Amino acid sequence: MSTRDRNSVVVGVDGSDSSKSAVRVAAELATERSLNLKIIHALDFAPYGFGGPYMDSGGVYEWVEASGKAILAEAQEEAFAVNPIIDVYTELSIGSSAQWLVDLSENARVVVVGASGAGAAATALLGNTAINVTSHAHCPVVVVRGDAHEGGPVVVGVDGSPTSERAISVAFQEASLRNAPLVAVHVWSDLGPTAFEDPRAAALVPQGLEEDEHAVLAESLAGWQEKYPDVLVTREVYIDNPRARLLAWSKKAQLLVVGSRGRGGFKGMLLGSTSNSLVGGAHCPVVVVRPARP
């Protein structure tokens, strides 16, 4: 997950089991890459009417701040359990955790978030945070969910777009670091997002189009296998719905890597929808790679 002189992994925490898992993953990433770890917690005053008449009564601010500090201290201990000598920095702030993570992503190597929070409302909130961060961050975002199936492959979704090229780069780096095989999956459904729900629809594919799609995958991978000769690569091309195929692969992958935007127009919207679906439903951790900034 290389980017220009960024030397930190940033993780957002809320005290939930999901965020504890995110801290462990973030600490592992930081350790493997010799980076420092920044753990952040956004103070949430919404339940107490931030700025309202109850804000200053009963020591609400002090209580929420103390709770936030305790969450950060516990997260720091989680990180030290992974690596006792890791460089860890913690910080509290008031406001939107999603916006804060997006701001910090400007200078981070990678941002890590959990996929669910503490309780139903928090789970919905953290899920929204994950979607917002993966949609707007300036660096790759790891959404920790499901199981990192030990011994499974790193799986990357490929569609031939510039963002997909960045996802391929991240996927090869991760596969090499993890000594894992890489599965490059190209799923196309140019006849529309629901066209291939009926298996008979495959007969509608124009002659030669399937060969063109195999060429898209081959061209996308050109040069990468030479750069990473240690990575065993398997290529898979499907005429299907991208979301369904990638979700199926997530059941046996240790990591799923996708771009957040596709080839533009309809396909761009489709891949954006696909990445959001994976953030919300994949069975393994997901890395969402953002487009290059103009």
Which stretches of residues belong to each language-model region?
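Structural beta-alpha unit
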Residues: M1-D5, S18, G59-E62, E77-V111, ...
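Small/aliphatic-rich secondary-structure junction motif
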Residues: S2-G58, P153-Q207, Q225-E236, P294
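Glycine-rich, Arg-bearing micro-motifs that act as flexible, cationic patches
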Residues: V113-N132, G151, L255-G281
